[in-house]
Amino acid sequence: MGVSVIDDTHLQAATSAQELVRVEGLRKTFHSGSQEITPLDGISFSIEHGEMVSIVGPSGAGKSTLLHILAALDTPTNGAVYFGASSLESLSETELAEYRSRAVGFVWQRHHLLPDFTAAENVAMPMLVRGEPMGQALRAAYDWLSEVGLADRAAQSAGELSGGEQQRVAIARALANRPALLLADEPTGDLDERSAENVFELMTRLHRSHHLTSILATHNLSLARRTDRILVLDHGKLVPGVDGLRGSAGSTAAYPAGTEAHISGDLG
């Protein structure tokens, strides 16, 4: 590919386009012994710039697999993912590494912080990997910790923080390189109800203030309903009539018949 999708000009072009992410005919299969597993089975959808979209569905529906492919942490068996006008498949390994570190931020269910490092050092890690000087990275990390309400915890070891605080640090780390696309895989799954609510409110505020495009996989239906749209995955497919369902942040259209069973049934 002649020009990187993530140089300044092309990143700006991708994020100013109405459609930031497009998925076409995405299929993922792997083998477990003699059995073929298909976590994603030919799904297609698009996400507009600035949307906050939730993905819900039963365990094993393909939510995590989808996010990993969108983050270029896994590759599809068939189909394509586009970031702006560029297909991820067309990117070189160097460009994919830049895409992962610059265009995308990822929040995991388990925060994956380094427990013996301070909160600020954890947030600074992505910037250090990109070659920023230590002092500059730590100053930026402090600013991000201030945004998530943890400026007073900057010098504290990550392992000493509460679960909700650790996830706030993880969110700050995911945003440290100022990505256009934020992916979150069950970011509130390990938290109590109050902490989950606080973390979701924080993500919503940051989504708006930093003009992010956010995709959230969650089992929490009450949170999903507060995003702009809900996509329901079941057995690797988008549920017909539910793709594009509006959450309360969008229109107040009624849920299609049977939707409640899909999104509030066995999501464990």
Question: Predicted regions: what is each one?
Answer:
Residues 1-29, 240-268:
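ABC-family P-loop ATPase nucleotide-binding domain
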Residues 19-226, 230-235:
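ABC family nucleotide-binding domain
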